[in-house]
Amino acid sequence: MAYFLEQTDSEIFEFIVEEFKRQNEHLEMIASENYTFPSVMEAMGSILTNKYAEGYPNKRYYGGCEVVDKIESLAIERAKKLFNCQFANVQAHSGSQANNAVYHALLKLYDKILGMDLSCGGHLTHGAKVSLTGKHYQSFSYGVGLDGYIDYEEALKIAQSVKPQIIVCGFSAYPREIDFKKFREIADAVGALLLGDIAHVAGLVVANEHAHPFPHCHVVSSTTHKTLRGPRGGLILTNDEEIAAKIDKAIFPGTQGGPLMHVIAAKAVGFKENLKPEFKAYAKLVKSNMQVLAKTLKEKNHKLVSGGTSNHLLLMDFLDKPYSGKDADIALGNAGITVNKNTIPGETRNPFVTSGIRIGSAALSARGMGAKEFEIIGNKISDILNDINNVSLQLHVKEELKTMANQFPVYHQPIF
C-alpha cells in the first residue's frame, strides 16, 4: 500500500511505522489509552479536516456548512441516544476543554469548586492548584478513607463547610465505582450543581457496567476515547435546557473557535460502534479482565489501593517498598508492559516519582485478550517487581510477551 506521507516526509512516516510496531509488540496498559476503531481513523483522516464551521448546525458563521451540519447533527443524536439524555455538545476538543467549558458556563470568577484530591484519584481540572481551575476558582477537595474508598460522609462535611457552587464527581485514578446518587444528595444539601466527569468510565456506563450519572448529575462531561474507543475529544451532556444553552455558549464563542469537523465525524462513527451489542460484550470483558489481574496480583501478595477494583483500572501501592512508581514504570516498560507512575492516597514521594502505578485493561481487551492472558501478565508483573533491578529478566519477559502480543494484532491490515 502506497502512502503519500512516505513520499513527502519519510522521517515522520518512519516514526509512525516505529510507533505502529511498538503498539503491536508492547502490552498497552495505561488506563487512559485504547485502540480506536479503523473506521474512526478513516473519518479523522478525511477531507473534513479542510472545513471551518464556527457556530452550530444551521447557525454557522461560515458558508458551505450544509454537509457538516448533517454530520454534527448526527453525532449529537447518537450521543443523546447512547447516554439516554436530552442535550449533547460534541465540539469540545478534549475532556479538559469540556470541564473548563462547564465551569465557564456555570460559575463566576472565584466561585468555589469541590473535587476529588489529586493524590486520591482526581484530575487536574477538578480544582488542582496548578491548573486553570485552581487559579480562576476557589478549589477545595475531598478524598478517600483508610480503606481507599471515597469517604462520602467526610465529603458532605467539607461541602457543608465550603458551600461550593459546583461539586465534581469523577476521577482519573480511582479503582472503584462512583455513587452518583450519594453525590447528588451532598450537592442538594448545600445547593450546589453536580458535574459528573465520566471520562474514564464512559464506555462502562453506556454498556451498563458502571452506574449511570443521570438522573443524578446536572451536567456530565467525558472524553470520547479511553473506554469508549473513539477519537481523542470531549463531550458534554445534560438534561437541563437552560444549562445546555449556557454550555453551547461556553464552548463557542466562550472557550473555542472552529470545531474540528473531522473529529466530530469520528465521534459519530465511534458512537455508532458503542451502540452495537458487541460493545457491551467488550465492556464486560474490560471489567472481568481487570478482576483477573487484581486477583493474580493479590495472590502474589502485592498491595492494591482499596484492595482491588470495580472498573477498568487498578492502582498498585508501593508506599512500603524500597522502589517507587517511577522505578516500576521503567522496569515494566523494559519488559514490554506500558503503565504509568501515579500518586496514591497517603503519597510520600513527589509527583515525578510517586509511590504507585496505574494499570488499565481497556486496550488489551480491545485486542481480544482474556482471562488467560491477564493471568499471565499479572504473574509477569509480579516477577518483574519482585526482582526490579534484574535487567536480563526484563528483556527475557519482553520477548515472551512479544510472542503473546503478536497473537493479538492491533489492526489486521496496514492502517496508520
From Swiss-Prot:
GO CC annotation, single: cytosol
Site positions per UniProt: Plays an important role in substrate specificity: 225
Cofactor(s) this protein cannot do without: pyridoxal 5'-phosphate
Enzyme class per UniProt: transferase
Subcellular location as annotated: Cytoplasm
Primary location group: cytoplasm
BP terms from Gene Ontology: glycine biosynthetic process from serine; tetrahydrofolate interconversion
The EC number(s) this enzyme carries: 2.1.2.1
One MF term in the entry's GO annotations: glycine hydroxymethyltransferase activity
Cysteines paired by S-S bonds: none
Subunit structure: Homodimer.
The family this protein is said to belong to: Belongs to the SHMT family.
Official protein name in the record: Serine hydroxymethyltransferase
Source organism of the structure: Helicobacter pylori (strain J99 / ATCC 700824)
Gene that encodes it: glyA
